[in-house]
Amino acid sequence: RDVERSRGLGDVYKRQPHDVAGLIRLMGGEKKFVSRLDTLFSMALPRKYYEKNEDIAEVSLVGGYVHGNEPSHHIPYLYAWTSQPWKTQYWLRTVMNRMYKNDIDGLGGNDDCGQMSAWYILSSMGFYPVCPGTDQYVLGAPYLPYMKVMLENGKTFEVKADKVSDKNRYVKSVKLNGKPYTKGFITQQDIMDGGTLTFEMTSSPNKKRVFNGTDRPYSLSSN
């Protein structure tokens, strides 16, 4: 017999990073999609469901979201396909605060192929490749006020978020090379061209900042 291991609600969001718009439709629309995603992060998961599972430890959980299970790493970014991308910004910082510490249990899972570390570095810069088969990095929110990438072509790519903090975790606006930027993603070429990605941070969600049309990240069924 074929055997498939499943982790319930988290697996629903794990399987389709290439077509989030299609998944939203299959789940009955944005309202239901967001509601179930909210539940994943906020639910109380009884210990009996993971205490004998070698891949899941309490330190790796945010609700029912298992950050220690690397194929789930794109899930906090899925709000970018909805009218509530600010929730990505909230949960990213929550995950980084809980899962990455300078302590004996400071990593919320084993670092398979360096993925736990790679997620942290990219998410600290404010973006992540939700669908690696494309050239897009979906925007979240930086964790650090300044990061600089030295590119192999001799150029540099900088990320600035001067006021970012646990309180100021929300993105008010974004600029790319000094110009207002409305897309929910940047591309590999944007990075390789060099330049500066600037995030204006605030303590309250900017609920008017949503991504529609071509500003929304890639989905197979809508591209």
Predicted features by range, described:
Residues 2-9, 13:
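Single conserved hydrophobic/aromatic residue that forms the stacking wall/gate
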Residues 35:
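Glycoside hydrolase catalytic-domain groove-lining segments
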Residues 26, 31, 39-49, 65-67, ...:
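Non-catalytic C-terminal accessory modules of carbohydrate-active enzymes
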Residues 1, 53, 100-102:
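Acidic/His metal-coordination segments adjacent to aromatic residues that form catalytic metal sites
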Residues 14-25:
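Extended catalytic-interface subdomain
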